[in-house]
Amino acid sequence: MTSPLSPYLVTLLKSLAEDAAAQRFPAGALYVLATPIGNLVDISIRALGVLEQVDAIACEDTRHTGQLIKRYGFSKPLISTHQHNEAAAAQKIIERLRNGDRIALVSDAGTPAISDPGARVVDAVLTQGLTVVPIAGPSAAVVALSASGLSGEGFQFVGFLPTKQAQRDSALQALKESAAVLVFYEAPHRVLDTITAMREAFGHQRRIVIARELSKLFEQIHRCSLSEAPAWLAADTDRQRGEFVLLIEGASRGGQDNEQFNEARRLLTLLLDECSVSQAAALAAKITGLKKNKLYAMALEIADQRS
């Protein structure tokens, strides 16, 4: 059940609308405009002001963008701009900018040129000395990162991995020593295979955050170890639906931490000669003071390597 906006919010929105109306939108500029990643009300008032002012919109999918702007009450000429025609579309856009038109550049969802078409258009416009204006807004990678609780030496946006297995596995191996939080996008039909490959590349104990359908009705954010992730995902087919952001915690750079974990691995290797995985993890936790769940994941990895 929805509740009406409070009088305060109504007044505030009217005030913000007046502020937006007073803003200047220079002619002959390309507006790189972020659109919602799922929830329509996540669009900014400034973005709506740009959509009202522009002469045309360069977009990835004209049908999708046409429906989106219609929802906000706009009708604008659309310029098809996707990965197969981006260079040609850039020239059309540059010509219109030189004639003083205002052009918005959007992707299907989120911020353009972030794992989506748009970078070549922006590069071409800047190369010609024309103006590019970013209009801030949603980005699935940043939204997922903010809700992950993972920290490291910054973060590294990877986007989509190669679709071929050998190339994918090679890319993961190249990233395994990175201390940054790694941010990936993945499609539903590949997500289980990708996470299984991540477990093999990064080890069972590394944590992963699986974020799907962000800002939408069935949004789900789940954090666990890579040892647990494939089983969690496979346990419910609904968990494999939608659009995914996958975040992997960075590799430890601390020498003391590495020494502790190396010692724990040696201890677990000995304990597993006589104990079950669970018993070995419990004993190692008492001896080392490390967290039992991480030791369990490490013991499971050692046991898997033996089998």
Report each predicted region and the residues it spans:
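Glycine-rich, flexible N-terminal cofactor/catalytic loop recognition
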Residues: T2-Q83
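General beta-strand structural signal in soluble alpha/beta enzymes
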Residues: C59, P134-G137, F184, I210
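A contiguous loop/helix-start segment that scaffolds small-molecule binding in enzyme catalytic cores
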Residues: P4-L12, D19, A27, V181, ...
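Conserved helicase motor
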Residues: S80-A87, L161-K164
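Loop/turn-to-beta-strand initiation segments
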Residues: G28-L30, N99-A104, A180-V181
